[in-house]
């Protein structure tokens, strides 16, 4: 009798996000073929740095991210729906956590537009290619890893009041662009510090 054939493997569910290898850097997200629509969803993967030690000074522009961790959003602590919960003891939590995603937009038109919707809990500074484009609930002046958010923001408020930002066209370039966010707690033992971001484009 002929050898039995193995059962066919089911096709992957296109709605299931791919889980990257935790031991390899997160790949650049290629959206060069997308003409319009959302390209970063809640639940997608981000590089993150959640150590009390500050990352490389060029973390938001050109720094190598191979030593960073990565996981699905939302990321942080205090949110039971977190895709990547930060489970370290409260004493080891950092005031500031850093999040990065590199995106290949391909060739850009003069009218190319990117819009971000950011969850801010408690404060945040948002960058594109190393240039600050928005700070929310943060003090003026120089920001560093020990800078606290200006006030506490509850998790429910953060989830329901996303901050919308249109990225200045002059900051975007052909090829790979870096979207980066630093999230700041209002105090060391804040009950929640979480990050999430969705983004859309129009060519």
Predicted segments with their positions:
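Ser/Thr/Gly/Pro-rich low-complexity, disordered linker/stalk segments of secreted
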Residues: 1-29
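Surface-exposed, low-complexity/disordered Ser/Thr/Gly/Pro/Asn-rich loops and linkers
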Residues: 64-100
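Short hydrophobic beta-strand segments in globular cytosolic domains
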Residues: 133-134
């Amino acid at each position: 009798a002929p050898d039995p054939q193995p059962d066919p493997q089911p096709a992957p569910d296109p709605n299931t996000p791919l889980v990257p290898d935790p031991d390899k850097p997160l790949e650049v997200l290629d959206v060069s073929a997308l003409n319009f629509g959302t390209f970063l969803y809640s639940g997608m993967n981000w590089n993150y740095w959640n150590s009390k030690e500050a990352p490389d000074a060029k973390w938001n522009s050109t720094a190598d991210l191979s030593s960073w961790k990565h996981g699905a959003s939302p990321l942080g602590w205090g949110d039971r729906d977190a895709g990547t919960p930060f489970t370290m003891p409260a004493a080891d939590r950092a005031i500031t956590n850093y999040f990065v995603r590199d995106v290949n937009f391909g060739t850009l038109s003069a009218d190319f537009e990117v819009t971000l919707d950011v969850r801010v809990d408690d404060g945040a500074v948002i960058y594109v290619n190393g240039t600050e484009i928005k700070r929310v609930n943060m003090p003026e002046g120089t920001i560093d890893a020990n800078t606290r958010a200006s006030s506490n923001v509850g998790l429910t408020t953060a989830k329901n009041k996303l901050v919308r930002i249109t990225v200045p066209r002059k900051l975007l370039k052909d090829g790979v662009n870096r979207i980066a966010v630093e999230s700041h707690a209002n105090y060391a033992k804040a009950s929640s510090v979480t990050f999430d971001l969705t983004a859309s484009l129009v060519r």
